[in-house]
């Protein structure tokens, strides 16, 4: 059972870049592991660090700014998560501590993978995202509230509505990944299997 997502209030970091691909999110040299943990240390590795080993932080990269340490909401530009279909991208984001990504658009595969890993991708219009970037840059350290039940983002004195597919919303609210969804039908599966001929079991 995955962690339930109903509402999250967190520090927002503005990544003012469009077309952020999965290789930028988690470079290919860090993909050897098949478990979901440990990838956060390499999130945006080529941008966060000046050296290949990830030991010299780049002071000009926004995730390294002191005011954004502990951020759990990532504000980004259009086509976030494009490139290859690696599921390691949402793994790296969640392992780092992100719960929500807000952008005007997402690559389709990344969008689906995010829900599978309890990372909420929130789609707002370009104009709304522009407003949020201006708000965050004028108020470093600002927190947003993201309410999945009400499907709204509360930022400053404004509220922004967003849409999520009902099925994906249900899964996030109830902490259901693909295994959890299957286990919801465990009795029906067992009943079906009992009806199968012996040679098919």
Curated annotation (Swiss-Prot):
Q: What keywords are assigned to this protein? A: Amino-acid biosynthesis, Branched-chain amino acid biosynthesis, Leucine biosynthesis, Lyase
Q: Name one GO cellular component term.
A: 3-isopropylmalate dehydratase complex
Catalysed conversion reaction: (2R,3S)-3-isopropylmalate = (2S)-2-isopropylmalate
Catalytic activity, EC: 4.2.1.33
For molecular function, the Gene Ontology terms on record are: 3-isopropylmalate dehydratase activity
- Which Gene Ontology biological process is one annotated for this entry? L-leucine biosynthetic process
Broad EC category: lyase
Question: In which pathway does this enzyme or protein participate?
Answer: Amino-acid biosynthesis; L-leucine biosynthesis; L-leucine from 3-methyl-2-oxobutanoate: step 2/4
Binding partners and assembly: Heterodimer of LeuC and LeuD.
The UniProt similarity line reads:
Belongs to the LeuD family. LeuD type 1 subfamily.
Q: What this chain does, per the record?
A: Catalyzes the isomerization between 2-isopropylmalate and 3-isopropylmalate, via the formation of 2-isopropylmaleate.
Q: What is this protein called?
A: 3-isopropylmalate dehydratase small subunit 1
